[in-house]
Curated annotation (Swiss-Prot):
SUPFAM superfamilies: PRTase-like. It catalyses: UMP + diphosphate = 5-phospho-alpha-D-ribose 1-diphosphate + uracil. The gene is upp. CDD domains: PRTases_typeI. 5-phospho-alpha-D-ribose 1-diphosphate binds at R77, R102, D129, P130, M131, L132, A133, T134, G135, G136, S137, D198. GO terms for biological process: UMP salvage; uracil salvage. It is an enzyme of class 2 (transferase). It comes from Dictyoglomus thermophilum (strain ATCC 35947 / DSM 3960 / H-6-12). This is Uracil phosphoribosyltransferase.
Amino acid sequence: MVIVVDHPLVQHKLTKLRDKNTGPKEFRELLFEISSLMLYEVTKNLPTKEVEVETPLGIAKGKVLDNKDLAIVPILRAGLVMADGMLQILPSAKVGHIGLYRDPETLKPVQYYTKLPEDIDKREVIVVDPMLATGGSAVAAISILKAKGVKDIKFVCIISAPEGIETLRNSHPDVDIYTAAIDERLNDHGYIIPGLGDAGDRLFGTK
């Protein structure tokens, strides 16, 4: 399933994120904020249980999360800021890291780092990466997690290309995709058009 998060606040901040005149500091802040906002949609079906708490004036019934263990796994390096935004809302989530880069010649992902919680196979995992372009990195990261025994995975990105969505759905049809926008296409270099450029470079001021 593909879920487009079209909340007005998300779309407002996404428009500013795309702007080529947005500098690294504001870009990081916007990505952080969009990721936090998108998490509400991603987690809206988490199980809850009813509890009672004592207020200064009496007893109130309420709901709390029902022991759903979560992990957030950013694809390095651009996914780091997204993970930070989500951790602000879910500070109890564990964090893993998967390092992948795209070979400029083949456009295939190359793995260079993986560090995951020991109990990752017992957790619902949210994989985050700002861009779903060719889909290669997302497919590779999710394959790594499944090899570790993870069964419940969601993928969250800011902008996606139709080609990347198709690739990910063909490889992992059980993984829901959350995105703030589906753009037109990929160019010959594997970049999303119109997109926002290279998210990692814009985040960290590199080229």
